[in-house]
Amino acid sequence: MQAVQPALAFLEPQFDPWVFRVVRLGLPWWLRWTKGIREVRLEGGEILAEWMAQFQRGQVRLILAYRHPTTADPPCLIHALANLLPPIAQAKGIPLRQPVHAHFMYDRGIPLWAGAVAAWLLPRLGATPIVRGRLDRQGLKAARSLLLDGPFPLAAAPEGGANGHSDILNPLEPGLAQLGFWCQEDLLKAHRPEQVIILPIHTRYQYLGDPEPAIAKLLTRLEQDCGIQADSGLSIRERLSRLGEQLLPQMEQFYSQFFPKPLTQALGSGDPEVLERLQRLLDSALRVAEFNLNLQPQGSLIDRRHRIEQAAWERIYCLDEAGNRQSPVEWGLANRIAQEAQLHLWHMRLVETFLAMTYPPHSPAPTPIGEAESALRFWALISRLKGQDPLKLPTPQLGCRRASFTIGDPVNVSQRWGDYQRNRRQAVQSLTDDLQQALMQLMHSH
């Protein structure tokens, strides 16, 4: 980032059937060659087909709440809806109109790293953006409108973003539950009889072959980057742990030595617990960014990361029409503010990727997919420490994978309307908790 940028425009959803047809036909090949996903499965597809048919008949408004371990989840789910669900419905005698699709909610920051193609394509697939870290009235209004009147169900990840772990479910954000209640409110105001239904969807990946040789090769590269002597006698789990043991004290020293003591003093406590040390490191990294962006460290790590991102964006993407008439000095100062905001944002990105270290010491039964995900998160972390942006690099392919979606039992939002009228906050939290439990049960059953 060398200069202040134009303000982020709202990317209005404008579904284009012709673009969708091309994407539907090309997705299987794109997933195979760019993501290594050779197969997509839809388990419990007859449940989804029945609810999709009810949606198309005008009986329900439908929310697809899917687990979000990787950035490949939305394209895989689009493929499952468009190409796998219609044959399942036909076999069960359930009539479905084409196209079978969903309006996906996505983070407004995705086109910033995915590029102009994503900024052009996502709206034409009917996707709707949301800005993290602040009350995005325009984004919420668009999502609320699509949920009420859109031609397709609304699909969203209640975790708020990809967490990189198939076996760890992040705490759910309350926004999806709130959207469900808003939709019920809008239906009642319009005297419409539809019910609001949330379908939980579990997402999981499996390697079709043994990924261990590819993981070992990637770990050798990462060990070289960290100055660690390779030891082929160690297991994958041991090598992952060794990477964490190397990086954690290195980053503790980095923050305690080069940043103000009030922000990093907790790092010197000598607590022997790795997880506690990691949490203190993440807190210190966020405090550095918050201090420089004039923010108070309030809320969870996720809330703090969102606020940091939004504060940095306000300094970077702030150029309006009047900006073209700034003096050279004003222009130079605006560029300086944008450059420094980008530097402060680096600490938040580091926290996002440093969570890789939580996997090796705390999973009693490592799985191939879990070890592969941990290796990839270490790759993302080390890439960022080397000054690269892992989002703009090709992700190492560790083998061919199968993506599977499992449809859970529906959650009826309309039946909770009385609870919402009595206590809105409690009803939203209760619905969020029940959705979390439903996704946890799906995850543990596979």
Indicate where each model-derived feature is located.
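Domain-scale detector for complete catalytic domains at protein termini or as standalone homologs
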Residues: A119-R132, L146
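Membrane-interfacial terminal anchoring regions of lipid-handling membrane enzymes
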Residues: M1-V100, R108-G109, A114, R132-G133, ...
